[in-house]
């Protein structure tokens, strides 16, 4: 399986301080859909047909682009002679015109949208629009897993409280699929260090989240990716999954809106190893790409001494250690191991 993030633009109609892109301050460029399709065709010819392409439309905000361009790329993705999946990440703070609504509900396998503490909703009207759009899509799709809510783990979000978050966001909007992502300090987050939690705060939060889920018996009702990544390690001995999967630089491509190519979308505007005009062979053998793969593969020395390495695998290499240690929720993992 290859994950392919296609950035339709580098800009957005919002300014979230945690965002790994740069919000409305991002470059005012839009994708060249013919070059995107040509690149996908090259990749399709190069890779084995039994390898699935999981394609996600990203930005900035994908739906500030022309709908005819979105439909053209969707047509091309579905025309490939292999198994494909097409989804989108979108802020849902815009009018759901009939053509947008049709594209989302008829052409995509699902969408991811975010709810965050600071900057995400600048007015009460924006929040109400977001909630209204979610309900509209839910009513049409009748699929509880179609919409995934993602929230970035910032200091303000931690202070907001788990119970309040579930009551005011998850339960209120009938959400059944969600994730809480660890913050990586890229893009706008570089300019806002006050929102970055310590790694101990991250570990403590996920332990408390697990306790909340256990107390309210929520695992049967809501899929929470960040916890499922941990649970399946213990229950199914499946170690390489989610953010603990240290092969992102090998199995992931991000096509920036200006036509440059990277891997991890969090650092895609700067960690570039080629362009869509390059051959796939040239991209794969790029010294910069090989260096990024090497960076991801090599663990900090301390990891090799840890008794949980087999479960953690070192974690996402974009998550740096601080004076409080790493971000892996060790207390939670140890308790789950002891219960098996």
Regions found by a protein language model. Give the residues of each.
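A C-terminal junction/extension of Radical SAM enzymes
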Residues: 186-270, 309-311
């Amino acid at each position: 399986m290859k994950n392919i993030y296609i950035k339709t633009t580098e800009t957005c109609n919002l300014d979230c301080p945690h965002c790994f892109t740069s919000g409305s301050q991002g470059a005012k460029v839009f994708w060249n859909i013919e070059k995107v399709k040509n690149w996908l065709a090259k990749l399709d010819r190069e890779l084995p047909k039994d390898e699935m392409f999981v394609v996600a439309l990203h930005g900035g905000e994908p739906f500030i682009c022309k709908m005819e361009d979105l439909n053209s790329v969707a047509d091309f993705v579905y025309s490939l002679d292999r198994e494909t999946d097409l989804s989108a990440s979108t802020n849902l703070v815009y009018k759901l015109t009939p053509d947008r609504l049709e594209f989302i509900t008829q052409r995509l396998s699902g969408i991811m949208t975010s709810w965050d503490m600071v900057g995400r909703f600048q007015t009460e009207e924006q929040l109400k629009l977001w909630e209204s759009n979610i309900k509209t899509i839910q009513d049409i799709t009748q699929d509880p897993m179609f919409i995934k809510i993602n929230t970035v783990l910032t200091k303000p979000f931690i202070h907001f409280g788990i119970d309040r978050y579930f009551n005011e966001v998850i339960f209120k909007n009938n959400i059944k699929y969600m994730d809480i992502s660890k913050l990586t300090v890229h893009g706008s987050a570089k300019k806002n260090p006050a929102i970055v939690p310590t790694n101990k705060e991250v570990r403590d939060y996920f332990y408390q989240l697990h306790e909340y889920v256990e107390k309210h018996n929520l695992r049967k009702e809501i899929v929470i990716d960040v916890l499922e990544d941990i649970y399946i390690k213990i229950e199914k001995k499946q170690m390489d999954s989610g953010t603990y999967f240290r092969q992102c630089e090998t199995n992931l491509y991000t096509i920036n809106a200006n036509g440059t190519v990277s891997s991890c979308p969090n650092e895609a505007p700067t960690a570039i190893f080629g362009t869509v005009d390059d051959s796939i062979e040239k991209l794969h053998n790029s010294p910069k790409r090989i260096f990024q793969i090497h960076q991801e593969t090599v663990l900090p020395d301390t990891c090799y001494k840890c008794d949980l390495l087999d479960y953690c695998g070192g974690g996402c290499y974009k998550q740096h250690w601080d004076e409080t240690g790493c971000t892996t929720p060790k207390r939670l993992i140890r308790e789950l191991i002891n219960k098996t």
